[in-house]
Amino acid sequence: MAYEKYVKLPGSERQPMPGATQAGSLDPNQLMQVTVGLRSRAAGSKQTSLDKLVSRGERLSRDEYEARYGASPADVQQVEIFASAHGLAVAQVNPAARTVILTGRCENFAKAFQVQLARYECEGSFYRGRTGYVSIPTELRGIITSVLGLDNRPQAQAHFRIAAAVNSASVGALAATSFTALQIAKAYNFPTGLTGKGQTIGIIELGGGFTQSDLNTYFSGLKISPVPTVVAVSVDGAQNQPTGDTNGPDTEVMLDIEVAGAVAPGARIVVYFAPNTDAGFLDAINQAAMDKVNSPSVISISWGGPESSWTAQSLQSFNSALQAAAAVGVTVCLAAGDNGSSDGVSDGLDHVDFPASSPFSLACGGTSITLSGSSISKEVVWNDGASGGATGGGVSDTFPIPAFQANANVPPSRNPGNFKGRGVPDVSGDADPATGYDVQVDGSSFAVGGTSAVAPLWAGLLALCNQSLGKPVGYLNPNLYQSVATKTGTLHDITSGNNGDFKAGPGWDACTGLGSPNGATLLQALSASASPTPTPTPAPKPKPKPKPKPKPKPKVKPKSKATKTKRSNHGKR
């Protein structure tokens, strides 16, 4: 089939990374992989029904979600025909995620999507990039919603900070005030007598890896036996590959596993390894959310980047994937970033981290704690300055303020336009490297902080809650804001400190959200607010058209009397 007319794909415009320069052409035979996003088979009122279902906290099975809101076979076929016409192969179709993964030669992808691909250099590293818009045939307008992976720049950063004692000396020296994850859990009054048994915690990683020997050493040191089960899942060819560099992604991977595993040692931990690209990251979220084999009830993600670093099509695609996770009852805990109110962008504006800024994420900010014995005597916003890091937080310039934050007093954005956006974060926990978490990485022990630690901390807590409740808490945000947080003592309200442009105060704030957890009391509030598991409603069936009624023969009346015509209800529903 010949495709003659093309149109620009909305939201696909891309610019080189800041400071990047073009460094030559690409080998036209270089093999590539690209993820094509498709529209939902639901449109109009059906999409509205999904929005309402999610906001009410109702859940669908993964099969039900695919049947109602996945990609239609006809749309998938259209993309398959398009791929074949350009010498591209279909590597994977994920109807529930509404994605088709294509593989092929660089030259063929460039022609298929009317783009110029080139080699770029940025700060000593190279990536495949493009500029401008992706174009698609007019026949696929409205069917294709995104094309990710043509550009394979590193899309996200890990949100961990190694304690200063490690950076200034040798790895192996613990910070004076570091804690084990168990001590942190006790300080936050996590419920006892629960292990997360029967739950699966999904963790998404965009690099690095873990070793079983490190896990054995760490958990045996905490006297946790047996060692939690940890399984690696490959996404888009990425593998569990430790680098041996404690300043690299290995520390992120081990921090996430060790914190979640210490808090919920009875839970099964599944780590989804994916390439650090927009396509790889999205595919990992989709695979974890729709995983019918491992079925995680909670997902922890400690990677992200400023909203301004993403294309509009990426923001839309990731947000849809997180909404899908919410629809099937999966809580997604996301680190809010470690660079304060600027999120590391030096343009003088405020920025929030994405995907944490999605309204379908449980965005996790950071605090600094002081313990008296095993109890918290003081807790403030984590802010160690520009070099030491600070909790991310602020107001989204992309996502409107969601209904669950309508009464949270979220201020308008301080940026030009004063957009009334989604407030970040939702909750918080200890993230200061100076009061950090002891970890075991690549054979060494040291202390780590950052909001990277808070996401798995909350994921572990929610796994305990899910075990106790006998069902997943699922999309927590509406219930959290409108019910749970209104109960006295469920969260510690942090009222002191700032993250740059935002200050902490009573109630929700753009530094620590609603506050840090009081675990046992939080579980009680969740139990009290939990409604019976809803019976899945069948997919709506079209209403039968009413049979036309025979028209009565008009009666002849004298002309001198007024004639009344009965109004027919035929055709009304």
What do the predicted segments below correspond to?
Residues 1-2, 573:
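Sec-dependent, cleavable N-terminal signal peptides
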Residues 2-93, 101, 106-366, 391, ...:
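Substrate-binding/charge-relay-adjacent region of secreted/lumenal peptidase catalytic domains
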Residues 368, 412-415, 462, 466-510, ...:
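An often Trp-containing, charged/polar helix-loop segment at the C-terminal end
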Residues 370-377:
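Short acidic, Gly/Pro-enriched loop/turn segments at secondary-structure junctions
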Residues 507, 524-536:
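Low-complexity, Gly/Ser/Thr/Pro-rich intrinsically disordered linker/tail segments
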Residues 531-573:
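Ser/Thr/Gly/Pro-rich low-complexity, disordered linker/stalk segments of secreted
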